[in-house]
Amino acid sequence: MQSINFRTARGNLSEVLNNVEAGEEVEITRRGREPAVIVSKATFEAYKKAALDAEFASLFDTLDSTNKELVNR
């Protein structure tokens, strides 16, 4: 992952976006702040889907446990 500061990113935005389009993740740092990461839309959507899948799996595990407890009463 490439890591650059905000000023460099702003001055080279076209190049940064070209790198992201080519599949690279770019971290942008700002003095005293949490860094941000730029990724392609496809990568971002894959991350979101994975997070939602994990959340649904957790919910289904909870529901399954609850159902088993109710059946075994």
Curated annotation (Swiss-Prot):
Superkingdom classification of source: Viruses
Record bears the keyword Repressor: yes
One GO biological process term: negative regulation of DNA-templated transcription
Cellular component per GO, a single term: protein-DNA complex
A GO MF term: DNA binding
Keywords: Repressor, Toxin-antitoxin system, Transcription, Transcription regulation
Chain spans, region Sufficient for antitoxin activity, its presence prevents formation of a doc-EF-Tu complex: 50-73
Signal peptide: none
Tagged with keyword Aminoacyl-tRNA synthetase: no
Gene3D superfamilies, sorted: YefM-like domain
Description of post-translational modifications: Degraded by the ClpXP protease.
A UniProt-annotated Pfam family: PhdYeFM_antitox
Additional observations: The concentration of phd in P1 lysogens is far greater than that of the toxin it antagonizes. Such an excess may assure the well-being of carriers of the addicting plasmid.
Family: Belongs to the phD/YefM antitoxin family.
Protein purpose: Antitoxin component of a type II toxin-antitoxin (TA) system. A labile antitoxin that binds to cognate doc toxin and neutralizes its ability to phosphorylate host EF-Tu. Does not reverse phosphorylation. Bacteriophage P1 lysogenizes bacteria as a low-copy number plasmid; phd and doc proteins function in unison to stabilize plasmid number by inducing a lethal response to P1 plasmid prophage loss.
Complex and partners: Homodimer. Interacts with cognate toxin doc, the exact ratio of doc:phd varies from 1:1 to 1:3. Interaction with doc prevents both kinase activity and dephosphorylation of EF-Tu.
Descriptive protein name: Antitoxin phd
Species assigned in the record: Escherichia phage P1
